[in-house]
Amino acid sequence: MADDMVYQEAVAAEVIQVNGRTGVTGEIFQVRCKILGGKDTGRILTRNVKGPVKLGDLIMLRETEREAKQLGKRRK
């Protein structure tokens, strides 16, 4: 069964802007990142990232086609 596993290539992206936090407890960061390799090199995406992240961090993306929805305004 282990021989049937298919590995997918990951593409590096640099965090260029941290837009905000989302999730029930704020554990998800919404970031804008610039793709550094692959067919979408230079494209800027909005993605949700779990865990601590800061400007200039490199993240590895399994796919570059999907983009996160913009965060809505917070209600009080």
Curated annotation (Swiss-Prot):
Top-rank lineage group of the source organism: Archaea
GO MF assignments: structural constituent of ribosome
A biological-process GO annotation: translation
A Pfam cross-reference name: Ribosomal_S28e
Protein name: Small ribosomal subunit protein eS28
One GO CC term on file: cytosolic small ribosomal subunit
Provenance organism: Methanococcus maripaludis (strain DSM 14266 / JCM 13030 / NBRC 101832 / S2 / LL)
CDD domains: S1_S28E
Protein family (similarity comment): Belongs to the eukaryotic ribosomal protein eS28 family.
HAMAP family: Ribosomal_eS28 (MF_00292)
Transport in keyword set: no
